[in-house]
Amino acid sequence: MQKIFNFFPLTVYKSSLSLSDNEKNEMIEEVRLMEKKSKNLDYKSPNKAWTGDTQGFEYLHNNLKFKNLFTQINNCILEYLENLSINHKKLDLYFQRSWATISKNTEHIDSHSHDQSHLSIAFYLKKQKDDAKIMFFDSSKHNEFIPQLFGSRSLAKDNIFKKRDILNSSRVVFDTNEDDLLIFPSKTIHGTEQGKSNSERISISADIVFLAKDSSTLEHLVPPVENWKKFSN
């Protein structure tokens, strides 16, 4: 009798956070104000979402209006680590940067990864059911035994696949609702659907880094920052 074994999964954490309408409205207005005060609008291309980290607003975790949100995110990060059986007591966790994104009409976010951090989050502060969904892309493609098999438009058009599922796909379209939080490795390539109409979709992104509390016997992990020495350049 045949058996199929699936190894090396990508684990994405999803949870719904509890925020009052007043809290959410205050954060939404704060994000809209940031958009009005953009410092780098030449960087924003047509049909691309507004991203606060490129406009001078990359430290939402230090903004008191977002305090409760980041407290809840903190707790969810610890739950994520528990699911991977990571002893977080041996690690120092830092919010490295955090920002808002605004998608209007057919604006989208190109596929990308956050290579300067370890974990990333996406929280949906304002989202309608029909707004664009997040997509995750598989850069390993362990099952793609023929080069370009999974991503070829011509092969898909020729019905080379009887059906598409997680075993033979190089991307996943993942549905979320307002108040949902996602946590995933920062190296994961992700973006949003293109050509979808958005009713001012507002999400909060954040990057998290991990440092060893004590690196005295460790070959890997980033050592404690208090032992670093800054260059005089």
Language-model-derived ranges and their functions:
Residues 3, 110-111, 193-197:
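Short proline/glycine-enriched turn/loop segments at secondary-structure junctions
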Residues 9-11, 96, 117-119, 200-202:
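Residues at beta-strand starts and edge strands
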Residues 103-181, 214-220:
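Catalytic core of non-heme Fe(II) oxygenases with the double-stranded beta-helix
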Residues 39-41, 141-150, 224-233:
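Short, cationic low-complexity segments
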Residues 98-100, 121-123, 204-208:
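A structural signal for short, well-ordered beta-strand segments
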Residues 161-233:
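Catalytic core of Fe(II)/2-oxoglutarate
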Residues 1-87, 108:
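Non-heme Fe(II)/2-oxoglutarate
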